[in-house]
Amino acid sequence: MSFDIAKYPTLALVDSTSELRLLPKESLPKLCDELRRYLLDSVSRSSGHFASGLGTVELTVALHYVYNTPFDQLIWDVGHQAYPHKILTGRRDKIGTIRQKGGLHPFPWRGESEYDVLSVGHSSTSISAGIGIAVAAEKEGKDRRTVCVIGDGAITAGMAFEAMNHAGDIKPDMLVILNDNEMSISENVGALNNHLAQLLSGKLYSSLREGGKKVFSGVPPIKELLKRTEEHIKGMVVPGTLFEELGFNYIGPVDGHDVLGLITTLKNMRDLKGPQFLHIMTKKGRGYEPAEKDPITFHAVPKFDPSSGCLPKSSGGLPSYSKIFGDWLCETAAKDSKLMAITPAMREGSGMVEFSRKFPDRYFDVAIAEQHAVTFAAGLAIGGYKPIVAIYSTFLQRAYDQVLHDVAIQKLPVMFAIDRAGIVGADGQTHQGAFDLSYLRCIPEMVIMTPGDENECRQMLYTGYHYNDGPTAVRYPRGNAVGVELTPLEKLPIGKGLVKRQGEKLAILNFGTLLPEAAKVAESLNATLVDMRFVKPLDETLILEMAERHEVLITLEENAIMGGAGSGVNEVLMAHRKVVPVLNIGLPDFFIPQGTQDEARAELGLDAAGIEAKIKDWLA
């Protein structure tokens, strides 16, 4: 869409932060209003993360107005909230391309702009990176400032507290801003707190505080009394004890939608030494009433009509794999009181809403704490329960040691329901589920299953849940099921594949998601098609039989080729000295950028036409 100068006259004056800083302060509330309306207009036309950005408009304007970006370095945690940042930093006219193939990256991305200091996508990384950047800036000696913006969800992760603990120890000059949009830490916002924040962030208070420490440094009892008195006075109105104990100077909470007040506070804090912590209160979805009322639904949106106040309803077609999992979960929980389900802050995405309502005492949302989620599940298993960790493939990476050390070594019956496995699409490199087969396959005695359709997915969930000799994993894709009939649940024989079609000369060994495409290719090439079902243990007998009866083997998976299921087939053949040509087809050795799933598969040659072309080229 083209930018409408008449509709956004103030925003039209700002295509860079240097232009922003030329505006008089009095015009900034109008700029914020236009920026919020432009964001609504753009994202409703193109789709994307929505509610978070509406809540950070004033903060974004204030930060770029006060700090000399990009010389001063601004780090956004996760990046859902960074759309206004992109608009103000030279990408205003391209915001309608965000999350699309060849368009703006969905998150801050170093390769896209010098204003994007840290490439992000997963949460809770900003403070750790910010400490490193701040230390580097101090050694550089050019008076470069470092600011990290983190949300109240991301700050629940252990990594954020590890970083703050370190910052409190080494005391770099940096500012951490907590964007609290869920009222989860404090509701204590108002004129008194805003006034107090400006006082506490001012140079007078800072110098008095430091001067007082120096004056009374030789008189321990009085120094301690002064410290306690100061903390008592602040503690009456400021809920910052935790952050102060970690070594930060805590300011807030302040109104995150008062752009002029934010500018005053940020200017006061800009020159303070040591780690500073500013707590701001915002409303997710600010300025668009439907998003304010339902920020979860409006967190990420498809194209929609803003005047309707509603998102388009699903066409009511095939269920998603997440729903298949959620339905199975409720069905199983109704029969077995030992079932416990765990999610690291992905209730809606993992299909667990109904379960959380029906079985609240057996539903555990541990927040953004993947490591804790896995070891918590280990504890439940030790206690005699049957834990299921529902987690996206890309986020399971964050808990790899816990899978190994706390679950697998102890052979605990924890089941991992791995959603978003394979190509995910619009969220790009940071969210593709490209690696789980590779990093799980090497874990001793792990059972790994890859369904080719929704019925198989249910059977595998049932099989994994009733397996008691160690951990299991069922990995399934983002998107809708394929429409097969659901049959009664029964346990599958562990490590056994299934021949779906008999052919000649060529055998396709398929692992999971691409089974429908593999079936088309097998029909076209008159190839044998095997639904391998298990990545670990592999059906070695069936693999050797296929090698004996065919001239060529093809392995097919939506996982990295390196270390994936195909590599396992190669290892079996080598171990048995079977010399047969094998073509491994899967995800290539690079990080896959954003685009729709269909676009990515077509570009990577993982649709039916692409798979057939790869095979023919290899055989030629």
From Swiss-Prot:
The lineage of its organism: Bacteria, Pseudomonadati, Pseudomonadota, Gammaproteobacteria, Enterobacterales. SUPFAM superfamilies: Thiamin diphosphate-binding fold (THDP-binding), TK C-terminal domain-like. It comes from the Bacteria. It comes from Citrobacter koseri (strain ATCC BAA-895 / CDC 4225-83 / SGSC4696). Keywords: Isoprene biosynthesis, Magnesium, Metal-binding, Thiamine biosynthesis, Thiamine pyrophosphate, Transferase. One of its GO terms (molecular function) is thiamine pyrophosphate binding. This is 1-deoxy-D-xylulose-5-phosphate synthase. Belongs to the transketolase family. DXPS subfamily. Its cofactor is Mg(2+); thiamine diphosphate. Catalyzes the acyloin condensation reaction between C atoms 2 and 3 of pyruvate and glyceraldehyde 3-phosphate to yield 1-deoxy-D-xylulose-5-phosphate (DXP). The keyword Metal-binding applies.
